[in-house]
Amino acid sequence: MPLNGDLDRQIEQLMECKPLGEADVKILCDQAKAILVEEYNVQPVKCPVTVCGDIHGQFYDLIELFRIGGNAPDTNYLFMGDYVDRGYYSVETVSLLVALKVRYRDRLTILRGNHESRQITQVYGFYDECLRKYGNANVWKYFTDLFDYLPLTALIESQVFCLHGGLSPSLDTLDNIRSLDRIQEVPHEGPMCDLLWSDPDDRCGWGISPRGAGYTFGQDIATQFNHNNGLSLISRAHQLVMEGYNWCQEKNVVTVFSAPNYCYRCGNMAAILEIGEKMEQNFLQFDPAPRQVEPDTTRKTPDYFL
């Protein structure tokens, strides 16, 4: 393990949106793997903690998030996935979050989103960005190998269940989730896929997801899941919400989205959710950071809402 001084220098460099060298990324990912392999599918988290949704390579908005919410390690953070793709700075964004995780392992929890996958990143920008910035795909491989180790969900004080997407018809209890083998590419279907892809819906029961992966789940499903598992709330990300957060399903579920003006054109606010020492909840909304000059990109990423 390198000394914290080395890591601190790397974090300082990354905070200026300057990517690490390829060799440093490899070492960083190896260190992160050693930490994440010890974490759980349902990673326990203590309060106070600030819960964050999708970032999607919007580096300067991540810096704005830290400005609003407080810097690590002064503030404990829980990120619910989707660090890469879409935005211009996926490399710098994921590098910074992983470096902070290695430096302050008990202060930062980083979960897996549906974009933390080999297949999705080859289509929606991260793979191309790695090629453009490093001249080869090695850094993409280091990070996508690391993504396999990210916890799938987190549980704040046994009360607030956090994950990227949503529930699964295959998983009635947290113990079902604990028994999954997560260290693999995100499958096309099945319980692990559902946790990263599903969405809440106005209709009751389970529905076919328009995304082509995961399911939609109704208020009846969320209420029963929370009751069965002694939960007060499901906190998830995965969907653009214009105010940055959105309560649904009789406040059994909240969506938190932390990429303001998503894709640099959606006009939405972002939000983060502060959970205090007595489990009190406070949403902080924020607008985009001042726009930087956009880098040239090799090709336009496809339009879609995943």
Curated annotation (Swiss-Prot):
The active site is at 115 (proton donor). Reversibly methyl esterified on Leu-306 by leucine carboxyl methyltransferase 1 (LCMT1) and pectin methylesterase 1 (PME1). Carboxyl methylation influences the affinity of the catalytic subunit for the different regulatory subunits, thereby modulating the PP2A holoenzyme's substrate specificity, enzyme activity and cellular localization. It holds the Pfam family Metallophos. PP2A consists of a common heterodimeric core enzyme, composed of a 36 kDa catalytic subunit (subunit C) and a 65 kDa constant regulatory subunit (subunit A), that associates with a variety of regulatory subunits such as subunits B (the R2/B/PR55/B55, R3/B''/PR72/PR130/PR59 and R5/B'/B56 families). Interacts with TAF12B. Interacts with SRK2E/OST1. Interacts with TAP46. This is Serine/threonine-protein phosphatase PP2A-1 catalytic subunit. InterPro entries: Calcineurin-like_PHP_ApaH, Metallo-depent_PP-like, PPA2-like, Ser/Thr-sp_prot-phosphatase. Its cofactor is Mn(2+). One of its GO terms (molecular function) is protein serine/threonine phosphatase activity.
